[in-house]
Amino acid sequence: MIRLLIADDEALERETLADIVARRFEHEVTIETAENGRKAADTAVLWGADLILMDIEMPGMNGLDAARAVLEQRPECKVIFVTAYSLFQYAHEAMHLGACDYLLKPVKDRKSTRLNSSH
């Protein structure tokens, strides 16, 4: 069973992503959520997340810093950034951190099939 963490400060985004993933991978995934970068980093490390769907702009600690903190302790964890920011700078930094993918919001149900190939 894959442990998936969805980190986004927007409750509707967290719920939508969780719903899409749960419908597509019902018996293959356990889902946890986090509403900010600090909680995402802590949850990912303590819970042992296998995969994180991470927003970039979140209060307190942004998603890039949260991913960096997680990957320092759990380098086997996979990170996919899901963000509204299409700036090359963000995508470049995300890939430099070792992100598996960089998806732009809104995420459509058809894009969730990419999650299966990312893990």
Q: Where do the model's predicted regions map?
A:
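Switch/coupling loops of ABC transporter nucleotide-binding domains
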Residues: 2, 29, 77
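Short helix-capping segments at alpha-helix termini
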Residues: 24-27, 73-75
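Amphipathic alpha1 helix at the N-terminus of the CheY-like receiver
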Residues: 12-26, 42
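CheY-like receiver
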Residues: 41-114
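Short hydrophobic/Thr-rich beta-strand motif most characteristic of the beta2 strand and flanking loop
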Residues: 25-35, 43, 91
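Positively charged, low-complexity/disordered segments
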Residues: 115-119
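Conserved acidic segment of CheY-like receiver
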Residues: 2-13, 17, 33, 52
